[in-house]
Amino acid sequence: MKATAPTPAESAPQLACIDGELENILFSSDNGTWHVAQAQLFDADAPNDRPIVVGALMHLDLHVPLRFYGMWDTHPTYGLQFKVQATVRQEPLTPAGITRYLATSGCPRLGAKTAEKLVAAFGSETLGVLREEPERVATLRGISPARAQRWQTFFQEQIALERIVGWLLQYDIDPSLAKRLHKEFGPQAIAMVQSNPYRLCTETFGVGFKTADRMALSMGWPRLGTARIVALWRYLLQQAVTLGDCYQTPEQMERAALKLLDGVTAADVREALEKALPDLNASRDLRWVEADDVVPTGRWTLAAMDGMERGLARIIRRHQREAPPAPSHTVDWAWLEGKTGVTYADAQKAAIEGVLRHPMSVITGGPGTGKTTILRGLLTWLKDHEQVDAETIALAAPTARAAKRMEEVTGHAAQTIHRLLEVTGDGFGYNSEAPLPEDWIVVDETSMLDLSIAWAFWQAIAPETRVLWVGDENQLPSVGAGAVLKDVIASGVVPVYRLGQNFRSTSGIVTNAYRVLTGTKPTRTEEFLWREYPRGQDKDEVRANLLTLLPWVQERWGFTWHEVQVLAPMRRGALGTETLNQAIRDMVNPRGVEPDWTGAFGKTFRVGDRVTQIRNNYRKGVFNGDIGFVERAEHPADVDDEDDEREPSDPSLDVRFGDTVVRYTAEETRELSLAYATTVHKAQGAEYPVVIMPLFWDAYMLCNRPVLYTALTRARHVAILLTEEGAMGHALRTAEGQRRQTLLAAHLATA
């Protein structure tokens, strides 16, 4: 293929492809995602037959025929270069080229010796035989039919992947998407996208509407066509759910649409929406709800979210009506206080007595208000005085960390809600058809419950089961959509017992947490330290200062970095979790002799890294917010001995979550993130010996009381706040963040 350089008349860089091979790798970035190399082109008429190529080189083997996709560019210092977007291996024609191609292909158990044997047997037909005639390959000594079949699959997939890469680049789409498309849609990936490119943004993880839209418009799809509007509406509602909302008003949808549709007016959107309404109404996953007393404008929602909110309200109200009467025992307080050694406050007594009377109850209160004391007293009364079998009492929490804390403070076995429901790859073992057998179920940290897990939980509750929810209504809402605890409390249909007395008044952390709730500036104590920087302080300097706190904390209090959690309001920015994670890791877990292990999206991992799961994975049994440590990083291994029957290992990462080790492929690590620093939202339900938090104007939208309160109450012994002039004051004046758009409270009140 002829290589061409750009002419001065060209107003924008044009995608080009050139054929050649790499002669020398000049530079590779630390994470292995960017390279500089010397190339030799096969086209003698190229503007430079030995150009420097820079960018994402997907293949780094030297002297292997490659096709480079990218753009010519003139660097002010280094001159003419080729900026690479993707590389695709080209099939060689000579025996030596085929041998080198096979030996560097990455195909399991196909190294240099085996490649020579194959080429000696099949010559220039070797690649075709590997792809189409595995039975001929299996006739060679030392190659089993099973291995030949695996090789056939490997090389057929390589062809498919390279075809997808080339096709995507026509539309200026990131070629890294090719592997995901092939994995999710198989050989039909290109046909699927051609039939409706908008499926990319609603069915493929990590692909936004802009990417799918760019491809669709390049393929000639109409700018205001029904397919575009339906896909946009679906995408916007899915994005709203990721931000916690269960519905959107027409005005919100229109504003969001205008941000994504270039060169389109509000009138255009309304006209296109009118034409698309039949298709929107016919879709099974989107729903328009007419105006009512709750949302006078009407609302758009995903059918699943609307169904869960309505269904959850019906189940809770039905449970209240159908539960058998509670035993009419009166609590013998002298006996219980003697048994537990606790003198209960009036509010605590009222809570225990109320919980015993009702089929469902809620206890809410901040740190130090006696929630744990009530739980211990309730469990003691049930087991010792009412002879309730301990096996019929289940304690659960949304995360493994919260469940472990619950077990430690109550002395009763606790588990995650997912384990309680016996999660499987395709659902839950306990559900509406097979309810949980327990008589009592107590769930702690219920502010973390999102709509989907609350829905799954209540579907598995039998009429005779008594349910107690415990949580702090002042904490941030769940990571997932909904505001379940707040909605249940606000509905007024469930008995709620609020605890307001602080029994830990000597704790500087607890005292200051309550000051934050009332909008009062915290005071410095032995347990709560903070430093205020001038407004506009250089964030790199702040980050450097934050890093010095890790050894200082160990020197002053004896807590190692494993016991310190850095919390930040947001992910991006100089003081966001992404930047902080890299900086903290390089300090506490620096790169060793082994190279970093590279996973999806160029993410890198090292043995010993603290990581968190960022999506629920029911098949693996790990869930959003779970924290683990990388225990083993397996790099690609090659086995080329004919007599060695071991199978080489694919790249994999082993992560220990508590007592469980979970294995991830490179592609699956898109579900993992470093967790040396994490968002305040992700830290819900956890408790750490030491918490360090930067709170700066960069995170203006997240400078509010719930964020500061939630972060502060995650600390058990020490909390350290780094802030900027005015930022804390703004947080204290902002009583709450953006209120989530949910309807569970309204449905509960009318169910």
Model-derived features: where do they sit?
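Conserved glycine(s) of the Walker
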Residues: 370
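Pre-Walker A (Motif I) flank of P-loop NTPase domains
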Residues: 357-363
